[in-house]
Amino acid sequence: MKALCMIRVQPGQVDRVLEILKRKRRVSKDVMVVSGRADICVILNTSITDINKIVIDLKNIKEIVSTETLIEVEVDLGW
C-alpha cells in the first residue's frame, strides 16, 4: 500500500525534522521538502499497519505541528 504523509513543522525546523526522519529506519527514503500547506512530504510504501505505526511515531516529534496522510485507493478506471 502507498501513502503520502504531509507534515507541517514549526517555523525554522525543517532541517531538524529532516535529520530526525533520516535516522528513522521505517520512514521511506522518499522525503521531500515542499511548498504549500505542508513543509515536508514522505512517500510510504508498506502495509497499512506499518503506515499507522509510522504516522503515530511522527506525532512524538515535538517539532512537527501536524500531519495529514493520504492513503492510496485502488480504482478501476477501465483504461
List the predicted regions and their residue ranges.
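A compositional/biophysical signature of low hydrophobicity enriched in polar/charged and small residues
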Residues: 1-79
